[in-house]
C-alpha cells in the first residue's frame, strides 16, 4: 500500500490551500456582485462588467480569470482524450488482472471498463475500491466495483459538462459520436486544468515545449499525443496509411497490441523502430521512448 511522508503530505496540503485561497480571492467580487444585483447577466457577462483591478492581481489570479473568460466558447471536443489514446480494461478481467494492468505502485485513480469493444463502455473502477477488494481478498469479476459514467456529445460546452458531472456525481464522461460509438473521454481533472492550468505531480515527466526530444542518434523521447507525422518526418519512414484511424504516436502503439500496454511494454513497429511505453495511465498513454536500430541521419540530430 502506498504511503506518503508527513513532509510530502504537508507540501500537498499547502499547495491545495494556496489554490483554494487564490480562487476564493478571485471570486469574492463576483459573489458580492450577485448579492447586490437583482437581475444579473450571464456569468461571463458579469466577469467582463466587473471593475477588477488587474494590477493588484497575482499572475495565478490573472491566468485563472483569463482561462474562465476563454471557457465560455470551449467544447468537449477541444479537450477530450481521443479514442485512439484511451486505455481500458475488459469486463471479463478479474481483480488480479486489473491490479497488474494498472500497476498499483503508480497512484492512478480510475480506469475504464468495457464490454466487448470500446464502443460499449460500462463504467469505471476507482482505485480505492480496488484496494479495498484486494485487502479483503475478494475474488471474481469487476462488475460489483464498477461506478457509473455519463455520456456527452463533442459539441457540449465545458461548463454544461461540469454542471452535469456535479448533478450526476461522477468524474468521467464518455464522448460519443453521431452513431453512438466512443469518440473520446473527459475527466473532472481535465475540466479543472482548463481553469487553473496544468496540474503536474511527481510522476509527470517533463519534455521540451514540443513534447518531442531527440536524445541521441538512436533514441527519441515523445509525448504519446504527438502526431505520427512528426515522427515520420524525423526518421524518413512512412508509419501511417491513409485508411488508418489513428493520428498520434500513442494511437500507433495501441493498434499494435492486443492488451493494455503498461509501463515497460516494448513494441516492434518496423524493422527499424521499437517503441517502449515509459508513462501511462489506465485510460491513456502519456510518454514513449522510440529506439531507432538504424539511427538518424546527422542532419536530424
UniProtKB/Swiss-Prot annotation:
Q: GO molecular function, one example?
A: flavin adenine dinucleotide binding
For this record, an example GO cellular component is: plasma membrane
Q: Domain CBS spans what residues?
A: 80-142, 145-202
Keywords (alphabetical) are: CBS domain, Repeat
Name the domain of life: Bacteria
* CDD domains reported in the protein's UniProt record: CBS_pair_CorC_HlyC_assoc
Check the record and name the PROSITE patterns matching this protein: CBS
SMART domains per the UniProt record, alphabetical: CorC_HlyC (SM01091)
Q: Spell out the family assignment given in the record's similarity comment.
A: Belongs to the UPF0053 family. Hemolysin C subfamily.
As a miscellaneous remark, the entry gives:
It is not know if this bacteria is hemolytic.
The protein's name in its UniProt record: Possible hemolysin C
Organismal lineage: Bacteria, Pseudomonadati, Pseudomonadota, Alphaproteobacteria, Rickettsiales
Amino acid at each position: 500500500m502506498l504511503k506518503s511522508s508527513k513532509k510530502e503530505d504537508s507540501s500537498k496540503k499547502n499547495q491545495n490551500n494556496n489554490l483554494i485561497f487564490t480562487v476564493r480571492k478571485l471570486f469574492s467580487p463576483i459573489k458580492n456582485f450577485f448579492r447586490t444585483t437583482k437581475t444579473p447577466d450571464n456569468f461571463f457577462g458579469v466577469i467582463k462588467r466587473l471593475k477588477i483591478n488587474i494590477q493588484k492581481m497575482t499572475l495565478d489570479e490573472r491566468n485563472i480569470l483569463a482561462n474562465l473568460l476563454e471557457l465560455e466558447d470551449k467544447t468537449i471536443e477541444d479537450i477530450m482524450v481521443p479514442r485512439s489514446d484511451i486505455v481500458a480494461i475488459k469486463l471479463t478481467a478479474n481483480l488480479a488482472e486489473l491490479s497488474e494492468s494498472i500497476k498499483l505502485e503508480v497512484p492512478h485513480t480510475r480506469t475504464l471498463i468495457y464490454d466487448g469493444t470500446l464502443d460499449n463502455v460500462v463504467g469505471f473502477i476507482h482505485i480505492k475500491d480496488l484496494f479495498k477488494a484486494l485487502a479483503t481478498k475478494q475474488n471474481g469479476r469487476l462488475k460489483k466495483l464498477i461506478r457509473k459514467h455519463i455520456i456527452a456529445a463533442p459539441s457540449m460546452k465545458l461548463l454544461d459538462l461540469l454542471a452535469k458531472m456535479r448533478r450526476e456525481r461522477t468524474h468521467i464522461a464518455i464522448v460519443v459520436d453521431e452513431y453512438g460509438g466512443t469518440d473520446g473521454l473527459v475527466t473532472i481533472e481535465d475540466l479543472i486544468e482548463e481553469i487553473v492550468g496544468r496540474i503536474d505531480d511527481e510522476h509527470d515527466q517533463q519534455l521540451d515545449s514540443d513534447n518531442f526530444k531527440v536524445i541521441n542518434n538512436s533514441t527519441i523521447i515523445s509525448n504519446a499525443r504527438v502526431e505520427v507525422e512528426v515522427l515520420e518526418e524525423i526518421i524518413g519512414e512512412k508509419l501511417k496509411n491513409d485508411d488508418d484511424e489513428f493520428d498520434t504516436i500513442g494511437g500507433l502503439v495501441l493498434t499494435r497490441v492486443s492488451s493494455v500496454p503498461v509501463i515497460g511494454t516494448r513494441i516492434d513497429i518496423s524493422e527499424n523502430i521499437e517503441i517502449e511505453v515509459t508513462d501511462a495511465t489506465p485510460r491513456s498513454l502519456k510518454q514513449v521512448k522510440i529506439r531507432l536500430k538504424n539511427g538518424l541521419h546527422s542532419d536530424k540530430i
